[in-house]
Amino acid sequence: MHVSPGRVTGKPSEQRTATFTGAVHMDPVLDTGKVVINTVIFTPGAHTYWHSHPGGQLLIVTAGRGIVASRSGDVHLVGVGDVVWTEPDEEHWHGARGDTLMTHTAVSHGTTQWGAEVAEADYSAASAG
Protein backbone atom coordinates (compact mmCIF):
# COMPACT_ATOMS: atom_id res chain seq x y z
CA MET A 1 0.00 0.00 0.00
CA HIS A 2 1.12 3.53 -0.70
CA VAL A 3 -0.52 6.68 0.65
CA SER A 4 0.47 9.87 -1.15
CA PRO A 5 0.25 13.33 0.45
CA GLY A 6 -1.55 14.68 -2.64
CA ARG A 7 1.54 15.76 -4.56
CA VAL A 8 5.20 14.80 -4.91
CA THR A 9 7.04 16.29 -1.92
CA GLY A 10 9.77 18.76 -2.83
CA LYS A 11 8.89 18.89 -6.53
CA PRO A 12 7.40 22.24 -7.61
CA SER A 13 4.71 22.85 -10.19
CA GLU A 14 6.25 23.53 -13.58
CA GLN A 15 5.36 25.08 -16.89
CA ARG A 16 5.79 22.52 -19.67
CA THR A 17 7.09 23.74 -23.01
CA ALA A 18 9.14 21.16 -24.93
CA THR A 19 6.27 18.81 -25.84
CA PHE A 20 3.28 21.13 -25.56
CA THR A 21 1.76 23.92 -27.66
CA GLY A 22 0.61 26.92 -25.60
CA ALA A 23 0.84 27.49 -21.85
CA VAL A 24 0.57 24.29 -19.83
CA HIS A 25 1.27 23.86 -16.13
CA MET A 26 1.80 20.54 -14.39
CA ASP A 27 1.56 19.67 -10.71
CA PRO A 28 3.14 16.30 -9.83
CA VAL A 29 0.93 14.10 -7.64
CA LEU A 30 2.69 10.72 -7.59
CA ASP A 31 5.63 9.05 -9.34
CA THR A 32 6.26 5.38 -8.50
CA GLY A 33 8.55 4.80 -11.46
CA LYS A 34 5.83 2.67 -13.09
CA VAL A 35 2.86 5.00 -12.71
CA VAL A 36 2.98 8.80 -12.91
CA ILE A 37 0.03 10.96 -11.82
CA ASN A 38 -0.09 14.67 -12.65
CA THR A 39 -2.65 17.43 -12.46
CA VAL A 40 -2.32 19.31 -15.75
CA ILE A 41 -3.75 22.76 -16.50
CA PHE A 42 -4.08 23.74 -20.17
CA THR A 43 -4.80 27.38 -21.01
CA PRO A 44 -7.27 27.98 -23.89
CA GLY A 45 -5.90 26.39 -27.06
CA ALA A 46 -2.98 24.65 -25.33
CA HIS A 47 -2.40 20.95 -26.02
CA THR A 48 0.15 18.15 -25.99
CA TYR A 49 2.21 16.89 -28.89
CA TRP A 50 1.41 13.43 -30.24
CA HIS A 51 2.45 10.83 -27.68
CA SER A 52 1.77 7.35 -26.32
CA HIS A 53 2.25 5.34 -23.13
CA PRO A 54 3.38 1.69 -23.09
CA GLY A 55 0.84 0.83 -20.38
CA GLY A 56 -1.90 3.25 -21.46
CA GLN A 57 -3.15 6.50 -19.93
CA LEU A 58 -6.23 7.47 -17.90
CA LEU A 59 -7.46 11.09 -18.02
CA ILE A 60 -10.10 12.52 -15.67
CA VAL A 61 -11.34 15.99 -16.67
CA THR A 62 -11.79 18.16 -13.57
CA ALA A 63 -12.39 21.64 -15.05
CA GLY A 64 -13.19 23.27 -18.38
CA ARG A 65 -13.61 21.62 -21.76
CA GLY A 66 -11.08 19.82 -23.89
CA ILE A 67 -10.25 17.61 -26.83
CA VAL A 68 -8.76 14.12 -27.01
CA ALA A 69 -7.74 12.77 -30.43
CA SER A 70 -6.02 9.61 -31.63
CA ARG A 71 -3.99 8.79 -34.75
CA SER A 72 -6.83 6.53 -35.86
CA GLY A 73 -8.97 9.65 -36.36
CA ASP A 74 -11.10 9.43 -33.22
CA VAL A 75 -11.82 12.90 -31.82
CA HIS A 76 -13.74 13.46 -28.59
CA LEU A 77 -14.82 16.71 -27.01
CA VAL A 78 -14.65 16.23 -23.25
CA GLY A 79 -15.83 18.09 -20.17
CA VAL A 80 -15.91 17.95 -16.39
CA GLY A 81 -16.37 14.42 -15.08
CA ASP A 82 -15.45 12.69 -18.34
CA VAL A 83 -12.97 9.82 -18.08
CA VAL A 84 -10.76 8.85 -21.02
CA TRP A 85 -8.71 5.67 -21.39
CA THR A 86 -6.08 5.46 -24.12
CA GLU A 87 -4.89 1.95 -24.85
CA PRO A 88 -1.22 0.96 -24.45
CA ASP A 89 0.89 2.47 -27.26
CA GLU A 90 -2.12 4.33 -28.73
CA GLU A 91 -0.75 7.56 -30.21
CA HIS A 92 -2.90 10.51 -29.16
CA TRP A 93 -2.96 14.13 -28.03
CA HIS A 94 -5.16 16.13 -25.66
CA GLY A 95 -5.67 19.67 -24.48
CA ALA A 96 -8.04 22.59 -24.03
CA ARG A 97 -10.54 23.87 -26.55
CA GLY A 98 -9.79 27.31 -27.97
CA ASP A 99 -12.29 29.18 -25.80
CA THR A 100 -11.69 27.65 -22.36
CA LEU A 101 -9.06 26.12 -20.14
CA MET A 102 -9.04 22.45 -19.25
CA THR A 103 -7.66 20.72 -16.19
CA HIS A 104 -7.30 16.98 -15.94
CA THR A 105 -5.69 14.39 -13.75
CA ALA A 106 -3.46 12.18 -15.89
CA VAL A 107 -2.51 8.68 -14.77
CA SER A 108 0.25 7.47 -17.10
CA HIS A 109 1.52 3.89 -17.12
CA GLY A 110 5.14 3.73 -18.25
CA THR A 111 7.42 6.36 -19.75
CA THR A 112 5.72 8.78 -22.16
CA GLN A 113 6.90 8.34 -25.74
CA TRP A 114 6.76 11.80 -27.34
CA GLY A 115 6.16 12.37 -31.05
CA ALA A 116 5.67 15.35 -33.35
CA GLU A 117 3.80 18.57 -32.73
CA VAL A 118 0.10 18.46 -33.65
CA ALA A 119 -0.46 20.37 -36.91
CA GLU A 120 -2.47 23.56 -36.43
CA ALA A 121 -4.95 22.39 -39.09
CA ASP A 122 -5.53 19.15 -37.15
CA TYR A 123 -6.06 21.03 -33.87
CA SER A 124 -8.46 23.50 -35.54
CA ALA A 125 -10.49 20.71 -37.16
CA ALA A 126 -10.74 18.79 -33.86
CA SER A 127 -11.66 21.93 -31.91
CA ALA A 128 -14.44 22.80 -34.36
CA GLY A 129 -16.13 19.43 -33.79
Predicted regions and their residues:
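Conserved short histidine dyad/triad with adjacent acidic residue
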Residues: 36-53, 88
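A short hydrophobic beta-strand segment most commonly corresponding to one strand
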Residues: 85, 99-117
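A short, N-terminal "cap"/entry segment at the start of jelly-roll beta-barrel domains
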Residues: 1-35, 113-129
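Short, conserved beta-strand element in jelly-roll/cupin
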Residues: 41-43, 52-68, 107-110
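Short acidic-glycine-tyrosine-enriched beta hairpin
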Residues: 72-88
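Short beta-strand His + acidic residue motifs that chelate non-heme Fe in jelly-roll/DSBH
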Residues: 48-50, 68-69, 86, 91-98
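A generic "binding-loop/recognition-motif" signal
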Residues: 46, 54-55, 74, 90, ...
